[in-house]
Regions:
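Domain-scale signature associated with acetyltransferase and cell-envelope carbohydrate enzymes
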Residues: 2-161, 185-186, 204, 220, ...
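Conserved catalytic-core motifs of eukaryotic protein kinase domains, centered on the activation segment
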Residues: 164, 171-172, 200, 235
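Beta-rich strand-turn-strand
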Residues: 139-143, 193-206, 212-215
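Short, flexible, glycine-rich and Lys/Arg-enriched loop motifs at helix boundaries
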Residues: 89-94, 166-174
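Glycine-rich NAD(P)-binding loop of Rossmann-like domains
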Residues: 173-184
Length: 239
């Protein structure tokens, strides 16, 4: 008897969705909007922590999370990404995660992202989390590559953008380097209302003061402040 593979896949998908809803209810999470996840390997999203004492989801969408994921997008890594966490029992905020065609989200450490945040990983772009904590109103937009290291602590209302999104014409010339990768190394503290722009490399142990606009590299162990941000102290540490 010939087996219709399409029917089997449809049945398997429905079973996984049903199981996922039960899991989310058990751990206190309500329904999130999940679109077009059918062709993504569910083992990348559910129970990849097999064998650990407590099996975890790779992506944990708390109440109010909206995930829009293209079927060709890839999610991998050994960590756990929690979206739209809240300081209070009732959470009035929403958080949006968008993974476009061939986008790559790599989760290598445990990451908590709080409410009212937006994360876009655009076509063929890569976002890497290695662990940390990011407060409300985080805005990450990736057109090339953004890498965020371990123990990175981000305050409220921070924007990280690796692209200008538009070309700039002046003196008969046209800008060509619209996008450039951003690297934030380990143990970095980013203050509230900070903007980090394309091509920036922030070294290990650096601190970015509140309100700074970072357009150039910040060396390891330095404090940068201002618009545009400049190094104002060296050989610092923080806890």
């Amino acid at each position: 008897m010939e087996i219709n593979r399409g029917i089997i896949m449809e049945m398997a998908h429905k079973m996984v969705v049903k199981k996922m809803k039960k899991i989310l209810n058990k751990i206190g999470l309500t329904k999130s909007i999940l679109r077009d996840w059918r062709k993504i390997a569910w083992t990348q999203l559910l129970w990849r922590a097999k064998g650990r004492k407590s099996a975890l989801l790779s992506v944990v969408p708390y109440k109010g999370t909206c995930i829009d994921c293209h079927s060709s997008a890839q999610i991998d890594g050994s960590g756990v990404l929690c979206l739209n966490k809240s300081w209070t029992k009732s959470n009035p905020f929403k958080t949006l995660l968008v993974l476009n065609r061939n986008a790559h989200l790599q989760i290598e450490g445990n990451v908590d992202i709080y409410g009212d945040s937006t994360i876009y990983v655009n076509e063929n772009a890569t976002l890497i989390f290695r662990g940390g904590y990011m407060n409300n109103r985080l805005n990450i937009s990736v057109f090339d590559r953004v890498e965020i290291g371990r123990k990175v602590y981000v305050s409220e209302n921070v924007s990280i953008r690796d692209s200008d999104n538009h070309t700039l014409m002046y003196d008969g010339k046209t800008s060509t380097n619209i996008s450039a990768p951003i690297v934030i190394e380990d143990n970095v503290w980013i203050g509230m209302n900070v903007t980090i722009l394309k091509g920036v490399h922030i070294g290990t142990g650096a601190v970015i003061a509140a309100g700074a606009v970072v357009t150039k590299d910040v060396p390891a162990g330095c404090l940068a402040a201002g618009v545009p941000a400049k190094v104002i102290r060296e050989n610092i540490s923080w806890s």
